[in-house]
Amino acid sequence: MTKQILVGGVPIGGGAPVVIQSMLNTKTTDVEGSLKQIRQLASAGCQIARLAVPNMEAARSFADICKDSPLPLVADIHFDYRLAIAAAEGGASKIRINPGNIGGEDRVKAVVEVCKDKHIPIRIGVNGGSLDKRLLEKYGHPTAEALVESAFEHLELLEKQGFYDTCVSMKSSTVPTMVAAARLFRTKCDYPLHIGVTETGPVRQGLIKSAMGIGALLLDGIGDTIRVSLTDDPVQEVYAARDILKAAGLRKDGVNIVSCPTCGRTRIDLIGLVNRVDEALKNCEKPITVAVMGCVVNGPGEAREADIGIAGGDGWGMIFEKGVQVEKLPYDELLPALLKRIEAL
């Protein structure tokens, strides 16, 4: 079991449920816009949000955002240790730094002192795209071993100051490298791990890479908090993270939709129906399985196994509830009837 840290009261590691994070894509200086996005993330199921703090103006805005945020906030810091101190003093629940790029040991010590005083954990964020040149020369390119060595070098900097309230991430845009780094790290250390594939590309590729990388580790029992990185609205990252956790069997809240890929036997607009069901239930917290099937081959069987489901016919469909057929309706009446019954469950 990993060590546990507390981020604004949210436990990470130590056997706690895996925590979902995301990062805002607003300008941090846009206080109202940032708060609006934080609230959207919270409504989608995000538990911790991270913001970029690139300068002192952003640090001042970050402090204003912290006052009204419904979520614990992480300040993402690079290069200037004074920004980390300002963010910690402004209300950050966690500081994300790369100790190797904020200056000498005295500057790391200054950050550690304020985080110790305010009981703020630090995430060491190692990234394959910003490894130290020395490690690149040693390993040739950003290998898993290079990422892990960088993480331990940074951990040592904090431990020298007596600081152990730490979480670690080792991210790569290459799935096998990220997975190998996390597995190697876990054999050597019990600090909690923040896992994710970085810079994943367009949404379709990003979802596949994230599901493979994060999912592989979760099935190994590795990973205490996750962030799905997508070139898209951050809210979509949260929905994807929830789905990954549900697919890995680590979350039971929310709807699990079972639907067939359609074939020549389908006689209803199943694709349209499934998309409408998914949209209507995306914020439903009921831990239920909903089957939306296109024909009578597998449809009745899947619908019977689900909590509630539809099996399509020729322009009509049957609704099953707890294995029992309860209604046969025209296609246009299926969705409202299904949603009404789900509401009553």
Which role does the model predict for each range below?
Residues G15-G33, A52-P54, L71-F79, L135-V148, ...:
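Active-site mouth loops of central-metabolism enzymes
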Residues N127, L135-K282:
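Catalytic alpha/beta core domains of metabolic enzymes, predominantly
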Residues K36, L41, R50-G90:
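N-terminal active-site wall of soluble small-molecule enzyme domains
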Residues V18-L24, A49-L51, L73-I77, I95-I97, ...:
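Hydrophobic faces of well-ordered beta-strands that scaffold small-molecule active sites
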Residues M56-I77, A110-I122, L184-L193, V277-E279:
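Alpha-helix-loop-beta-strand connector modules within alpha/beta enzyme cores
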Residues N25, D30-V31, A42-C66, R96-G104, ...:
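Glycine-rich, proline-tolerant flexible connector loops at the mouths of alpha/beta enzymes
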Residues R82-R123:
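Hydrophobic or amphipathic alpha-helical targeting/insertion segments
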Residues M1-M23, K116, E279:
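N-terminal amphipathic alpha-helix/helix-capping segment at the start of soluble metabolic enzymes
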